[in-house]
């Protein structure tokens, strides 16, 4: 009986201690009112507390549902579990009438630093707490109330934009179905502008795959595998948080080299940079034999098409992150999502311009969008090389070699002059830096030119050369993955790895593409060219945009501590991928496809105007312009 009474006494003390700390910290940490960037209604948080009746209500809480929904001692403390979340939804749903008073639930989470102590003698009515000798310091408090997500300007803009898209989609789909099935009219003869928002037409176009002459089919598999690898890597990173109840197990699992590939997804970004550079040259050399001066005369179209092609989906995901995604779910860790909502409301323009990897890198609106900013920046400077590639063979090789030498030299000098010891410096000044990521892009341009000059040729490569190339590619790939695992105590080796690792990975990817195109891919080409990859490759850009928000929603909406294991990791990865595919498909049908059609119609109209103007000029006039599509 003595032990039972002792345990009950300790539970009472812990519960009262938690409640008093929650209320006290809440009172002493009011945010400034009137801030336009708040994501929660802190004015509501302030108004619900009546200090005069607080002490009386505290005495009544033990007999209410608060006791059941509140903090419990964490289970598994020896495996690094240090958080007890209580019951988030039960806590917020509490609304009880006790002795003529209405008590509503408020969810509070307090972070404490057990290494420091402080006596809170100023706390009113807590002599019982001081007598126990309990001392602590509060590091931070997170508090939530029911209905504390106010509608802001971003929400109203999102409602207006997506309501307009919905109306246009309904009207366009109705027109399309009426023309196709009621009037039995050939779609070619119907108005393309009126049916550009049609769900029927856009879905049919998205799911129809036809063979195209000169297409590199193996790229579909590479794109799909790369986006899955990126989602998996971000799933692993998202699972490393204070709500993971067995972080010790996490570090044990990833202390093994065999599991290093799970968190090496950053190499997939270099794969995308390789593909971007490769397709830039491969398509530019293939479209109507574009000349050097035509590129310069139409450089504004070159830049504009790149921006317009990526802008609709990018603007869509930024607007959703700043508004709709904040309201689709909720949980004990929703501050994880709210932080990104706040950043997107403040710094949305850095993602759209795009300068996200340069301006304010510590408060990025969806931090994974740095890749898109970098890709556009590389396309902006690419004409410095592309101009020479569009000339003779000699000028093309000279331009490509100079471009590769310049990018490698710049990356190497930059890595040797800087120290990336801290995680912040490594991410901001190395991982998301355009200078260090440029070499794979230029390597892709080189192999794009090689594929172009060998288009339609039947190359004969000795078996030993192909075997040696495969061996070198696989060895290099494994080395690049292993480099991320190893801790380099030699500063020279560390800087050399930083300078050339991404380039080595890019060469390995390009070799696989090359042998697949020229007929030496074998089972690798068969696997990468399977039709099952085509759909995911087609929506891979949208998947890259949406997967981060999906992961934020999953881990932000947790209500119990997350138990990490490889099995649970892959379950979360599978669900995140499924939700991402659904969101991406819907966005491609409702946003990307209509905008793509509108861009083509506008470009077609501009081209027709240019042709008409040229036809009206004398015969000695300059030849007509050819617009570049990349």
Predicted regions and their residues:
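Exoplasmic/lumenal regions adjacent to the first transmembrane segment
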Residues: 1-221, 226, 233-269, 273, ...
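Kinked, hydrophobic transmembrane alpha-helices enriched for aromatic residues
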Residues: 17-21, 214-252, 259-281, 308-327, ...
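Interfacial loop-to-helix transition and helix-capping segments at the boundaries
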Residues: 148-162, 188, 214-220, 256-269, ...
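Hydrophobic alpha-helical transmembrane segments
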Residues: 158-159, 373, 397-401, 504, ...
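Hydrophobic core of alpha-helical transmembrane segments in multi-pass integral membrane proteins
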Residues: 160-174, 322, 404-415, 470-485, ...
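Structural signal for the C-terminal ends of transmembrane alpha-helices
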Residues: 171-178, 281-288, 387-393, 447-456, ...
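Solvent-exposed interhelical
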Residues: 379-405, 450-466
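Alpha-helical transmembrane segments of multi-pass integral membrane proteins
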Residues: 437, 441-447, 466-594, 611-617, ...
């Amino acid at each position: 009986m003595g032990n039972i009474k002792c345990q009950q006494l300790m539970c009472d003390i812990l519960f009262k201690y938690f409640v008093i700390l929650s209320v006290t910290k809440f009172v002493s940490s009011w945010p400034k009112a009137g801030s336009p960037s708040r994501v929660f209604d802190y004015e509501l948080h302030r108004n619900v507390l009546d200090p005069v009746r607080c002490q009386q209500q505290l005495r009544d809480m033990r007999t209410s549902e608060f006791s059941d929904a509140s903090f419990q001692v964490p289970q598994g403390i020896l495996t690094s579990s240090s958080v007890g979340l209580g019951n988030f939804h039960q806590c917020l749903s509490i609304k009880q009438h006790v002795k003529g008073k209405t008590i509503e639930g408020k969810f509070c989470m307090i972070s404490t630093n057990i290494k420091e102590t402080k006596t809170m003698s100023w706390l009113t009515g807590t002599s019982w707490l001081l007598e126990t000798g309990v001392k602590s310091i509060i590091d931070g408090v997170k508090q939530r109330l029911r209905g504390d997500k106010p509608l802001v300007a971003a929400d109203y803009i999102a409602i207006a934009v997506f309501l307009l898209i919905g109306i246009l989609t309904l009207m366009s789909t109705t027109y399309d179905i009426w023309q196709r099935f009621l009037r039995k009219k050939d779609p070619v003869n119907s108005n393309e502008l009126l049916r550009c928002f049609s769900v029927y037409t856009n879905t049919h176009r998205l799911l129809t795959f036809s063979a195209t002459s000169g297409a590199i089919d193996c790229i579909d598999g590479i794109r799909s595998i790369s986006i899955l690898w990126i989602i998996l890597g971000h799933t692993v990173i998202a699972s490393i948080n204070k709500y993971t109840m067995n972080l010790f197990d996490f570090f044990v699992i990833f202390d093994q080299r065999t599991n290093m590939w799970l968190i090496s997804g950053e190499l997939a970004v270099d794969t995308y940079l390789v593909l971007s550079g490769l397709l830039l040259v491969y398509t530019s050399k293939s479209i109507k034999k574009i000349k050097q001066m035509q590129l310069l005369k139409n450089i504004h179209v070159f830049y504009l098409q790149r921006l317009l092609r990526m802008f609709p989906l990018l603007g869509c995901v930024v607007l959703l992150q700043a508004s709709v995604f904040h309201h689709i779910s909720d949980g004990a860790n929703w501050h994880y999502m709210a932080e990104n909502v706040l950043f997107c409301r403040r710094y949305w323009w850095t993602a759209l311009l795009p300068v996200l990897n340069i301006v304010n890198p510590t408060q990025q609106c969806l931090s994974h969008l740095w890749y898109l900013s970098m890709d556009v920046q590389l396309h902006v400077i690419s004409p410095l090389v592309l101009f020479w590639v569009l000339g003779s063979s000699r000028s093309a090789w000279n331009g490509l070699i100079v471009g590769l030498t310049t990018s490698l030299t710049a990356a190497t000098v930059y890595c040797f002059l800087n120290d990336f010891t801290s995680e912040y410096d490594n991410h901001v000044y190395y991982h998301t830096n355009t200078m260090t990521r440029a070499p794979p892009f230029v390597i892709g341009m080189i192999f794009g030119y090689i594929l172009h000059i060998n288009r339609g040729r039947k190359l004969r490569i000795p078996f030993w050369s192909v075997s040696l190339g495969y061996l070198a590619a696989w060895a290099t790939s494994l080395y690049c993955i292993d480099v991320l695992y190893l801790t380099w105590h030699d500063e020279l080796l560390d800087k050399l790895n930083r300078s050339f690792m991404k380039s080595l990975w890019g060469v390995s990817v390009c070799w696989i593409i090359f042998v697949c195109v020229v007929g030496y891919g074998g089972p690798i080409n068969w696997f990468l060219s399977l039709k099952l990859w085509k759909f995911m490759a087609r929506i891979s850009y949208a998947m890259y945009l949406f997967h981060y928000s999906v992961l934020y929603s999953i881990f932000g909406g947790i209500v119990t501590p997350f138990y990490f294991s490889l099995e649970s990791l892959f379950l979360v990865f599978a669900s995140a991928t499924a939700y991402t595919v659904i969101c991406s498909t819907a966005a491609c049908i409702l946003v990307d496809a209509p905008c793509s059609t509108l861009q083509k119609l506008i470009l077609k109209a501009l081209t027709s105007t240019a042709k008409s103007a040229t036809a009206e000029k004398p015969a000695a006039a300059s030849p007509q312009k050819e617009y570049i599509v990349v």
